[in-house]
Amino acid sequence: MSQSIQFSTPSHTPHLLHLPHSQFNRPLSSISFRRFPLTTIKYTSIRASSSSSPSPDLDSSSSSSSSQVLLSPNGTGAVKSDERSVVATAVTTDTSGIEVDTVTEAELKENGFRSTRRTKLICTIGPATCGFEQLEALAVGGMNVARLNMCHGTRDWHRGVIRSVRRLNEEKGFAVAIMMDTEGSEIHMGDLGGEASAKAEDGEVWTFTVRAFDSSRPERTISVSYDGFAEDVRVGDELLVDGGMVRFEVIEKIGPDVKCLCTDPGLLLPRANLTFWRDGSLVRERNAMLPTISSKDWLDIDFGIAEGVDFIAVSFVKSAEVINHLKSYLAARSRGGEIGVIAKIESIDSLTNLEEIILASDGAMVARGDLGAQIPLEQVPAAQQRIVQVCRALNKPVIVASQLLESMIEYPTPTRAEVADVSEAVRQRSDALMLSGESAMGQFPDKALTVLRTVSLRIERWWREEKRHESVPLQAIGSSFSDKISEEICNSAAKMANNLGVDAVFVYTTSGHMASLVSRCRPDCPIFAFTTTTSVRRRLNLQWGLIPFRLSFSDDMESNLNKTFSLLKSRGMIKSGDLVIAVSDMLQSIQVMNVP
């Protein structure tokens, strides 16, 4: 028999406290939180209402015009007595299917609920992984999101990758989302004259220039995207390439050319970011006034809209205004599905305005490479943890990126320090980990992805074995009263899931918001997120612990649950006796039941 809880708002019930916007600038540890009291009413179902009037009586004296509420005999929830025959007919005759990721389905069949990975994996697609077979290998290996870096490649090349990923989803049963990364207006190197890379050796002199070349450029010469580069830089400045992967010292300026001595050798990649330091401080000069979204970026964004990408990651975000401007543009021009906007936190401005940027965005990326070129290296770990915590508090997915397994670009096994770095990001409960050069141009992209997957699974299992249920309070974020109810339902569902040791949380959601609220709580069990649209299903594939399904459903939870149980049991993903908690953004309810 199920136990069902639904929420009403009687006049004596205190309202949730909403955290004022001004509080977002305070450290999380200094904020006090207030819990919404939850009363469990056994074997009873109460409709949610936004009215402030007392809830109706629950005894037999209720109005005779109201349909009687009964517990369903198969233990799957409450159903009106005059609707039971309709529900039975619907369940019996409904033959529509359910869509789930092929790899996840296999994991559930073979190893059960606890085998599923909670941390999501993102792969940057490049020359090493752009073929259909290579993309399929990544999807089989656990790739949840394919990232396209618009710093590299032509739009035609990116279009081909997008269509290959879409074909992979349609033909092979995956739900790989697509993220497009804008180049941004910061200083970048050119394309290295068509070469895939170049090696800078210690003691070599290289020329960085703003000149354009009609023919082949001289040896060891690199073009720079910023016209004011030669004017802003001074002799003695330190030039960092790609967040410090290669370092130069400025030794001479000759007109538009800047001669630099290589002091830390390394690999130079096309379109790599450039920063320069003077007396231990980052030199910003006029490049600080460059727009966040360049004219090229707007053309790339139009391309992304036309191709129907799922996310657009914005580089070098300085303020929330940029995010809001882009979201308005997308809302006016995107066709059908909503495109999520991810803010890349990779500059001093991003950290200064962190809370307002994350609040405005649909997620954030900790771009540690470029961030480490703008703040001292020893501050990067603390910055990462702060960004992850703020994203979690504000219910925004967070991606930890850059140099996770950098050595695997050239070597088949990672360093032990890299494994420890990955495990720390998993312990921080980040939503996703991202490969960059490891998958785009590395020699071992599949092995790098395998390392991310296996380390994530092991650390997550260790967390559960140690019963490290989190006691960190989460601030209230709902603005409307309905949102506050949904938030408390999800908080309660996650806590109940941990305390009762349930096998899975089922979330029926049209927009994906309620699934994200459950994910925010990081319950021990997997979260089955059922949604009606393919685009929402793909976007949910970025968030921690969510297994997104596409399923047509109604506002009748009895019908939805019976249909879901039937379909999942027929495919071997659940079995009779499994304990499940179900929540819905249609009825704002919690139901606890065993699979019949």
From Swiss-Prot:
Obligatory cofactor(s):
Mg(2+); K(+)
Main EC class the enzyme belongs to:
transferase
Source species? Arabidopsis thaliana (Mouse-ear cress)
Q: Which GO cellular component terms are attached?
A: chloroplast; chloroplast stroma
Keywords associated with the record = ATP-binding, Chloroplast, Glycolysis, Kinase, Magnesium, Metal-binding, Nucleotide-binding, Plastid, Potassium, Pyruvate, Transferase, Transit peptide
Biological processes annotated in GO: lipid metabolic process; seed maturation
Domain of life of the organism encoding this protein: Eukaryota
Would you tell me the protein name for this molecule? Plastidial pyruvate kinase 1, chloroplastic
**Known role:** Required for plastidial pyruvate kinase activity. Involved in seed oil accumulation, embryo development and seed storage compounds mobilization upon germination.
Family per record: Belongs to the pyruvate kinase family.
Residues annotated as binding ATP are N149, M150, C151, H152
Q: What is its EC number?
A: 2.7.1.40
The entry's K(+)-binding residues are N149, D181, T182
- Per the UniProt record, the site (Transition state stabilizer) maps to K344
Q: What happens when the gene is disrupted?
A: Reduced plastidial pyruvate kinase activity and altered seed oil content leading to wrinkled seeds, retarded embryo elongation and reduced seed germination.
Q: Where does Mg(2+) bind?
A: E346, D370
Which InterPro entries does this UniProt record tie to the protein? Pyr_Knase, Pyrv/PenolPyrv_kinase-like_dom, Pyrv_kinase-like_dom_sf, Pyrv_Knase-like_insert_dom_sf, Pyrv_Knase_AS, Pyrv_Knase_brl, Pyrv_Knase_C, Pyrv_Knase_C_sf
Q: According to its UniProt record, where is this protein located?
A: Plastid, Chloroplast stroma
Q: What is this protein's tissue specificity according to the annotation?
A: Mostly expressed in seeds, and, to a lower extent, in roots, leaves (veins and trichomes), stems, inflorescences, siliques, pollen (grains and tubes) and flowers (sepals and petals).
What gene is it encoded by? Answer: PKP1
Quote the record's note on pH dependence. Answer: Optimum pH is 7.8-8.2.
Q: List residues binding substrate.
A: R147, K344, G369, D370, S402
